[in-house]
C-alpha cells in the first residue's frame, strides 16, 4: 500500500500534520484555501515557497509560509507583507496574520527539489544533470535517501518513457519514516514532463504534536510574524 498511495497522506495523523487547520463550512473553506494558495504561489513565484499552512479561528486567519528566500516575501521593513494582506482581502474578510519561516536546508525539501528540476527542464537544461545535482546536494546535507522519478518525452524523444534515480533508502511502508514527497510538472516545448521526489530524512519515534507545525526534527527558522 505504501508504494501506491500519496506518501504524505499515508502518514497523515501519524507523523504528518494537516496544512489546513479549521472546521465547519467545509465546501466554502476548502475553496477559499485553494484560491489563497494558488494566488500566493503565483504572486511569490520567485520566493521558493515550499508549503502554505492556513489556520482559522473565529476572528482571524493565520497564514504560515515556509520559504528558502523569505526576504523576497517580507520586503523592506515588512512592506511586502502589508501589500499581501491588502491583496488577500479579496478572498478573506477577517483579520489576517502572516508568519514566515525560513527553510535552512532546501536540499531536504521535496517541493523545492522538484521545482528546481522543473525549472531547469523548462530552461532546456539536461534532466540527468539536474537530477544528479539534486541527489548529490541532498546526500551532502545528511538525507538518508532520495528517489526521483521523471516521465514524459525526455530530451524531446518521440516516445514518452519513465526513468527512476535512487540513492540510499526510501522505506515507503514504514510509517515512522519521515519521508517528504512532492509531485510537479515541467511545461516544455515537447509537452509536459512529470517529476516525483521522495526524500528520506530519518525516523520519528514516540508521539508527535501534529498541530505545532514547525517544531519538527528538521527545524525551520521563524523570520517574520506580524
From Swiss-Prot:
The protein's name in its UniProt record: Small ribosomal subunit protein uS3
InterPro entries named among the record's database cross-references: KH_dom, KH_dom-like_a/b, KH_dom_type_2, KH_sf_prok-type, Ribosomal_S3_C_sf, Ribosomal_uS3_bac-typ, Ribosomal_uS3_C, Ribosomal_uS3_CS
Keyword rRNA-binding: yes
UniProt xrefs under CDD domains: KH-II_30S_S3 (cd02412)
Assigned protein family: Belongs to the universal ribosomal protein uS3 family.
Keyword Ribosomal protein attributed: yes
Subunit text: Part of the 30S ribosomal subunit. Forms a tight complex with proteins S10 and S14.
Keyword entries, A-Z: Ribonucleoprotein, Ribosomal protein, RNA-binding, rRNA-binding
GO biological process: one example: translation
An example molecular function term from Gene Ontology annotations: mRNA binding
Domain of life the protein comes from: Bacteria
Entry's Gene Ontology cellular component terms: cytosolic small ribosomal subunit
Stated role: Binds the lower part of the 30S subunit head. Binds mRNA in the 70S ribosome, positioning it for translation.
Organism: Karelsulcia muelleri (strain GWSS)
PANTHER family, A to Z: 30S/40S RIBOSOMAL PROTEIN S3, SMALL RIBOSOMAL SUBUNIT PROTEIN US3C
Domain (KH type-2): residue spans on this chain: 36-104
A Pfam entry, by short name: Ribosomal_S3_C
Amino acid at each position: 500500500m505504501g508504494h501506491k498511495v500519496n506518501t504524505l497522506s499515508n502518514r497523515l495523523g501519524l507523523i504528518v500534520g494537516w496544512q489546513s487547520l479549521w472546521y465547519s463550512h467545509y465546501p466554502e473553506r476548502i475553496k477559499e484555501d485553494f484560491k489563497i494558495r494558488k494566488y500566493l504561489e503565483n504572486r511569490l513565484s520567485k520566493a521558493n515557497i515550499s508549503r502554505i499552512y492556513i489556520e482559522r479561528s473565529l476572528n482571524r486567519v493565520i497564514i504560515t509560509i515556509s520559504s528558502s528566500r523569505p526576504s523576497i516575501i517580507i520586503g523592506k521593513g515588512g512592506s511586502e507583507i502589508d501589500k499581501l494582506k491588502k491583496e488577500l482581502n479579496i478572498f478573506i474578510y477577517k483579520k489576517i496574520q502572516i508568519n514566515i519561516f525560513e527553510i535552512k536546508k532546501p536540499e531536504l525539501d521535496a517541493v523545492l527539489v522538484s521545482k528546481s528540476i522543473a525549472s531547469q527542464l523548462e530552461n532546456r537544461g539536461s534532466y540527468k544533470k539536474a537530477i544528479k545535482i539534486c541527489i548529490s546536494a541532498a546526500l551532502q546535507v545528511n538525507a538518508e535517501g532520495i528517489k526521483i522519478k521523471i516521465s514524459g518525452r525526455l530530451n524531446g524523444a518521440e516516445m514518452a518513457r519513465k526513468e527512476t534515480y535512487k540513492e540510499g533508502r526510501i522505506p515507503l511502508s514504514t510509517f515512522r519514516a519521515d519521508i517528504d514527497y512532492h509531485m510537479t510538472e515541467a511545461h516544455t516545448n515537447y509537452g509536459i514532463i512529470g517529476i516525483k521526489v521522495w526524500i528520506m530524512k530519518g525516523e520519528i519515534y514516540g508521539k508527535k504534536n501534529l498541530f505545532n507545525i514547525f517544531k519538527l526534527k528538521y527545524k525551520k527558522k521563524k523570520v517574520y510574524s506580524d
